[in-house]
Amino acid sequence: KDSLALWDVLSRLGYQAVGLHIELGIGEYSKRSLEVTQAFARERGLELLVVDLKEAYGFGVPELARLSGRVACSACGLSKRYIINQVAVEEGFRVVATGHNLDDEAAVLFGNLLNPQEETLSRQGPVLPEKPGLAARVKPFYRFSEREVVSCTLLRGIRYLHEECPNAKGAKSLLYKEALNLVERSMPGAKLRFLDGFLEKIRPRLDVGEE
C-alpha cells in the first residue's frame, strides 16, 4: 500500500515515476501482489517494470533464505535492496523513492539501536545521496504514519493487498512496531520525536557509511 500511495502522489505531482515490482516467489501471495500492482499501473497509465527473482536468479525468497541461512525477512530485504539499486543504475534512474513510513522507520531505528552498528545507523534517514554505483534514495513518507498512508489510499481509491506476507510471522520488526505502538498510545507523537531526535542530535555525528 505504501509504495502504491507514493507512486500515486509522485505521478500527480508531475514526476515521471516508473514503478518497480519484484516477484519474490512467495506462492499465491506474490501472485496476488503482482496482479494488484499491474492493475494499479494499468488503470493510471503508468510504466511498471517487473523483475521475477526466480527467472532472473533461479531462486525465490524461500530458497534464498535456506541457502543463505538467513531468516526470510532478512533475505527478502537484502535481495530487494540489491535489485532495486541494480535496476535503477542499469535504467539510468538517479533517484529511488520508497514508501517506507514513520512506523517502518521508527521500528528500524529501534532495532538498530538495540544492536548498534555505526555504519548501519549512519544510513538511517529520509535521504541518502547518490554514490558511484548507487542511486540516491529518498523516503518521502518518512514522517507520515502508517495510519495516514492508509487514509491516503482510501481517499484516493487505491486498491492494495491487505494480507500480511506469510513470511512476516515472527519477524523482529513486528515486535519492535508493537512496542513502539504501546509507547505511542501513552505518549502521542513519541515515534516522530524518536526519529527527529536521532536525525537532529545523533545522525550528524556519524559519517555516512558506504553501502
Feature-to-residue mapping (PLM):
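ATP-dependent adenylation/nucleotidyltransferase module used to activate substrates
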Residues: 1-122, 134, 142-155
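ATP/NTP-dependent adenylation/nucleotidyl-transfer catalytic domains that generate, transfer
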Residues: 18, 41, 120-211
